[in-house]
């Protein structure tokens, strides 16, 4: 099977939505019965985004096989059924690390190591490996054309396209077509210059996706096609929409998928977008609105919680409730108290690292428990719930996590030094281990306890969910906490690590060590988020009576 490649680049400005465009195109091609995968090539020097600040880079998305990757891979998994792996995302740093390791080993037999051919060859090898076994591979190059960091990647995809031939490779370029209110017209010159920049490095785009706040009329698209040497039918207008899940239908209405399948000579059925039509229908036809408070430390950049944001929306789709997220900085709770939490229908505390703001998260868990407000804790959100319960219910004054206070009286959360993954392999860590890539990562088996909320929601005795953490509940102190009324309802593969906790005498208080947001999709939703949003709606109804 010959894989067909679609290379996606962006020009004029950053944040044009290359990831959404790539994922939407993939969704249409998948709906035509094609086996599609998507890759993201990131030009930064970090080996992976695992140690990057969420307020700079946004969320770190974790794949099933435990790779810490770009948040765009989350978009990919939400739009197509193909599961991403560590082969779907790599960086300049990863490429250079691989090449330098080979050089030190003597693999290059004394050759002078250069960007061309050694770095570009390494990029091509990884792209080919990631595309293996798929009919279509969509390859998104991060950054903006013209950035110095992107040049090796652009050169590599130029070479690869030449090697596989015109019938197996196409280039799709996203640009901005701004509307100038003073002139009362759309301006195409930035797009022309962006394409000129691409041409200067040997790439002629086959398709232009033109981003704008309005539909670009046919005469303007014809003008863009003429000056950029692209057929008019391949100049696609992608206007701003109120939901990203409308993009597949928007692109399909302009026959973008047919343009690719015709060029590639692929015979396949017409795209059935009924599942996406259902998503859009559910989104537009909610019966009520709930407000969920997200208490975190990275709230200045909502993209730091991208998958959580989307999972809450998916929970709303499955319960016919519109979800409004109120972002609350946990540090503000420390200074202003519970007033910031008033009027919420539910409280969610997501994952995070470091001591800053942790006491505010503990207060949020306390407020939710004492006021019977639905609470969902994720990763650190479970740990702070344990700390709060230990302090205020189990009588363990001074309880904390050893991550934040090593000499605390009751270290109810501590470093995981050893665990068994779902395949039976023993993983070990110490406090001296590197920060990058050393956490408990990826999909892990979890046993659910009978007669628990989570067992009822999932409808299965075992589940697989993705993890990203170094710290876990201290089992030595667990009996005292459980005796006070908290219940452990989820356990790891070897049944030694606490994965889920509940408070039985609370209407809905559930916290998980794993990250359920990474497996939520708009078409299928997720059991935990659907249950959480439903509980928020029920809480709202109780308070309106």
Swiss-Prot record:
GO cellular component: cytosol
Gene Ontology terms, MF aspect: ATP binding; CTP synthase activity; glutaminase activity; identical protein binding; metal ion binding
InterPro entries in the cross-refs: Class_I_gatase-like, CTP_synthase, CTP_synthase_N, GATASE, GATase1_CTP_Synthase, P-loop_NTPase
Record entry for activity regulation: Allosterically activated by GTP, when glutamine is the substrate; GTP has no effect on the reaction when ammonia is the substrate. The allosteric effector GTP functions by stabilizing the protein conformation that binds the tetrahedral intermediate(s) formed during glutamine hydrolysis. Inhibited by the product CTP, via allosteric rather than competitive inhibition.
Catalytic activity: UTP + L-glutamine + ATP + H2O = CTP + L-glutamate + ADP + phosphate + 2 H(+); L-glutamine + H2O = L-glutamate + NH4(+); UTP + NH4(+) + ATP = CTP + ADP + phosphate + 2 H(+)
PROSITE patterns for this protein: GATASE_TYPE_1
Segments traversing the membrane: none
Residues that bind ATP: 15-20, 72, 239-241
Similarity remark: Belongs to the CTP synthase family.
Record PANTHER family: CTP SYNTHASE, CTP SYNTHASE-RELATED
HAMAP family for this protein: PyrG
Subunit structure and binding partners: Homotetramer.
Purpose: Catalyzes the ATP-dependent amination of UTP to CTP with either L-glutamine or ammonia as the source of nitrogen. Regulates intracellular CTP levels through interactions with the four ribonucleotide triphosphates.
Protein name listed in UniProt: CTP synthase
């Amino acid at each position: 099977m010959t894989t067909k490649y679609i290379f996606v680049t962006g020009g004029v400005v950053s944040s044009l939505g290359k990831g959404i465009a790539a994922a939407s195109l993939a969704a249409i091609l998948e709906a035509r019965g094609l086996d599609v995968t998507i890759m993201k090539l990131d030009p930064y020097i970090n080996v992976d985004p695992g140690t990057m600040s969420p307020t700079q880079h946004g969320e770190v998305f974790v794949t099933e096989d435990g790779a810490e990757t770009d948040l765009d891979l989350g978009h990919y998994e939400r739009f197509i059924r193909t599961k991403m792996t560590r082969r779907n995302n790599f960086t300049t740093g990863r490429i250079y690390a691989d090449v330098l390791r080979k050089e030190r080993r003597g693999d290059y037999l004394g050759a002078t190591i250069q960007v061309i051919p050694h770095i570009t060859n390494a990029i091509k090898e990884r792209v080919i490996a990631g595309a293996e076994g798929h009919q279509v591979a969509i390859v998104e190059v991060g950054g903006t054309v013209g950035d110095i960091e992107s040049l090796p990647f652009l050169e590599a995809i130029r070479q690869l396209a030449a090697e596989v031939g015109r019938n197996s490779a196409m280039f799709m370029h996203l640009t901005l077509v701004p509307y100038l209110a003073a002139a009362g017209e759309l301006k195409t010159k930035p797009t022309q210059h962006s394409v000129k920049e691409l041409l200067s490095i040997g790439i002629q785009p086959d398709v232009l996706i033109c981003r704008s706040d309005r539909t670009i009329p046919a005469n303007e698209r014809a003008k863009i096609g003429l000056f950029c040497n692209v057929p008019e039918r391949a100049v696609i207008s992608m206007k701003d929409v109120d939901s990203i899940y409308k993009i597949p239908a928007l692109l399909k209405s302009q026959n973008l998928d047919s343009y690719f399948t015709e060029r590639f000579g692929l015979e396949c059925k017409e795209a059935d977008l009924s599942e996406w039509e259902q998503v859009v229908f559910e989104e537009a036809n909610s019966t009520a609105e709930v407000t969920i408070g997200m208490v975190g430390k990275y709230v200045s950049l909502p993209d730091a919680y991208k998958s959580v944001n989307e999972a809450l929306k998916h929970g709303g789709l499955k319960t016919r409730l519109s979800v409004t997220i109120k972002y609350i900085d946990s540090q503000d709770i420390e200074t202003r108290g519970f007033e910031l939490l008033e009027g919420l229908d539910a409280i969610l505390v997501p994952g995070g690292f470091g001591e800053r703001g942790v006491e505010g998260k503990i207060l949020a868990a306390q407020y939710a428990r004492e006021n019977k407000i639905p609470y969902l804790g994720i990763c650190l959100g479970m740990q702070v719930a344990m700390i709060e319960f230990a302090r205020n219910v189990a009588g363990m004054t001074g309880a904390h996590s050893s991550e934040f206070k090593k000499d605390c009286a009751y270290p109810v959360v501590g470093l995981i030094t050893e665990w068994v993954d779902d395949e039976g392999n023993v993983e070990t860590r110490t406090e001296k281990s590197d920060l990058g890539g050393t956490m408990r990562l990826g999909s892990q088996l979890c046993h659910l306890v009978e007669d628990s909320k989570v067992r009822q929601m999932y409808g299965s005795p075992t589940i697989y969910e993705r993890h990203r953490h170094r710290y876990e509940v201290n089992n030595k102190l667990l009996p005292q906490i459980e005796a006070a009324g908290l219940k452990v309802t989820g356990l790891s593969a070897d049944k030694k690590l606490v994965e889920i906790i509940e408070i039985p005498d609370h209407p809905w208080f559930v916290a998980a060590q794993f990250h359920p947001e990474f497996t939520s999709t708009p078409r299928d939703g997720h059991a935990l988020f659907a249950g959480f949003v439903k509980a928020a709606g029920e809480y709202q109804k109780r308070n309106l009576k």
